[in-house]
Structure formats: structure tokens, C-alpha cells
Amino acid sequence: MDNGLKVILFEKLPEGDLQMIEERVWSMNMVTALEHVNYIVVGGREFEAVEGRLNVDEGKLELLLVPMRTEG
């Protein structure tokens, strides 16, 4: 049975610091979809996925996201 993979989303702030947005289990279908997408919507905000890191020690996929600029 597939329990998915824990994914941690980090936002890169303008100052260069990282802020954790969330941590949740993704299905393997969602993880596989990362091969085909550049943008992720979470909490009603759109981000560009710029890097990913597989943390084997903790069994987690860590994604670095940059917020998209919105004109308003």
C-alpha cells in the first residue's frame, strides 16, 4: 500500500531567508506531477518551484518556492 511521501514547502523570502509554508503527505501521483509543473498553488497563493531536495535521512521531499508577483 502506498502511503505517499512527506513534502515540506519552503518559501524563499526577499531577504533570502526560508520560511516553512507547510508539511503534508502527498500521493505519489502528486509527486510524479512535479516532473510536468513549474508552479504550485498553496493556501490560495501561487509559487514557482525552483529547487527540490530529497532528504533521505528524514524521508522527506523539500521544495523551495518563490512567490509569483501579482499586479494589483
Language-model region placement:
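N-terminal acidic leader/helix
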Residues: 1-34
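Glycine- and charge-enriched low-complexity intrinsically disordered segments
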Residues: 2, 68-72
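Broad gene-expression machinery/nucleic-acid interaction feature
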Residues: 4, 49, 60-62
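A structural detector for beta-sheet-dominated domains
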Residues: 8-10, 50, 64-66
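Short, solvent-exposed secondary-structure boundary/capping segments
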Residues: 56-67
